[in-house]
Design a protein with these regions (language model features):
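Helical cap/lid subdomain of alpha/beta-hydrolase-fold lipid enzymes
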Residues: 1-180
Length: 180
C-alpha cells in the first residue's frame, strides 16, 4: 500500500509512492471522474430492472466572458482548482460542474434509459432530479464548515427527502419480492 513503513525514510517512501502501480491502473476513483473513465465505467454497467436509480446533481460555477466556467466564490475551497479545470473543457456542455463532477456526467449514463424524477420512484431507469444550483459536491454531505450559503435547515430537508426516497424505494422493491 501507500502507507509509509515503520523503518522507511521519507525520501524512500516518496520514491516508492511515486513508482507505485496505482498510477498506471485505471481502477481508481480519480480515473472514474474523468470523461474517459466515466465512459468506460458506463460501458461496463447495465440497468437492473429491480433496482431504483436516482441521480442528484449540483453545480457551483458561472460563465466567464470567454465562455468557460469558473468556480463560484462559495465553492468548497479545495474543489475550486478542479472546478476551474473542468470549467475549461473543450466541449462546452462538459464545463458546468460542482467542483468534482460535470453536470452532464452526473445526470445519467449516456447509454442507458432515463427520465425526469417525480414523486413516484421507478425501477430499472435512471431518475434525474433537478440540478441544485449554487451547490457544490460537498454540500450534499454538509462537510463544508465555511459554507455560508447552505443553511442547516436546507441540508436537513435534503437529507430527510433522501430518507423518504429510500423508504419509498424499499417499499417498491419489497412489494415485488412479496409478489414473487
Amino acid at each position: 500500500g501507500l502507507k509509509q513503513q515503520p523503518d522507511e525514510s521519507y525520501l524512500s517512501y516518496l520514491s516508492r509512492t511515486k513508482t507505485s502501480k496505482l498510477w498506471q491502473t485505471k481502477d481508481n476513483a480519480l480515473y472514474d471522474l474523468t470523461r474517459d473513465g466515466a465512459t468506460d465505467l458506463n460501458r461496463k454497467t447495465s440497468l437492473n430492472p429491480n433496482i431504483v436509480y436516482k441521480t442528484y446533481t449540483a453545480e457551483a460555477t458561472h460563465p466567464t466572458l470567454i465562455g468557460k466556467q469558473k468556480a463560484d466564490y462559495n465553492m468548497f475551497l479545495p474543489f475550486t482548482v478542479t472546478g476551474n479545470v473542468i470549467g475549461k473543457a473543450t466541449e462546452k456542455e462538459w464545463r458546468e460542474n460542482d467542483g468534482l463532477v460535470s453536470v452532464i456526467s452526473s445526470q445519467h449514463p449516456f447509454n442507458q434509459k432515463y427520465t425526469q424524477a417525480t414523486d413516484q420512484n421507478q425501477k430499472g431507469i435512471w431518475q434525474v432530479t433537478p440540478t441544485k444550483h449554487d451547490w457544490d459536491h460537498v454540500d450534499f454531505v454538509g462537510q463544508d464548515s465555511s459554507d455560508t450559503v447552505r443553511t442547516r435547515e436546507e441540508l436537513q430537508q435534503f437529507w430527510h427527502s433522501l430518507a423518504d426516497d429510500l423508504v419509498q424505494s424499499e417499499k417498491l422493491t419489497s412489494e415485488q419480492k412479496a409478489q414473487a
